[in-house]
Amino acid sequence: MPLYEHVFLARQDASAQQVEELTTQITGVIEGLGGKVTKTESWGLRSLTYRMNKNRKAHFVLLNIDGPAAVVSEIERQERINEDVIRYLTVRVDEHEEGPSAMMRKADRDRERDDRGPREGGFRGDREGRGDRDGFRGDRGPRRPREDADAPAAAVEE
């Protein structure tokens, strides 16, 4: 049977439990038509690049599906009807990716970075409250006197 990766976005105001129920419902449709879900990943509530149907965020869910084409057409039909689903995308793949998807690996990498703790000296490092513009910078000399715009160019050159 063909292999598919299916991602759908659920509305931001849907609870995690509602998204889980929606995933269970879609999985039931797939299994009812002779397919099977080999992997389910919930990527959580993430920001959208642009507003979709007045939503700025959405719950992202990935399903790896092994089943006939009729399964895909039926779950897409069900998702068009369901008001909680903002967008969906199904892609046929040659083989499913083993282990966590790229999005989950990225989330793990971000969590590892957060484990490093705060930087020494806070955000500003060793600048001790000196911003870019505070106090005398000492890297510039005094300003040159302004030349009058009214004076002719020959008089300025002397």
Curated annotation (Swiss-Prot):
Pfam families: Ribosomal_S6. Residues 92-149 have a biased composition (Basic and acidic residues). Keywords: Ribonucleoprotein, Ribosomal protein, RNA-binding, rRNA-binding. CDD domains: bS6. Residues 92-158 are annotated as: Disordered. SUPFAM superfamilies: Ribosomal protein S6. InterPro entries: Ribosomal_bS6 (IPR000529), Ribosomal_bS6_sf (IPR035980), Ribosomal_S6_plastid/chlpt (IPR020814), Transl_elong_EF1B/ribsomal_bS6 (IPR014717). One of its GO terms (molecular function) is small ribosomal subunit rRNA binding. The initiator methionine may be removed. Belongs to the bacterial ribosomal protein bS6 family. NCBIfam families: S6. Binds together with bS18 to 16S ribosomal RNA. This is Small ribosomal subunit protein bS6. It comes from Rhodopseudomonas palustris (strain ATCC BAA-98 / CGA009).
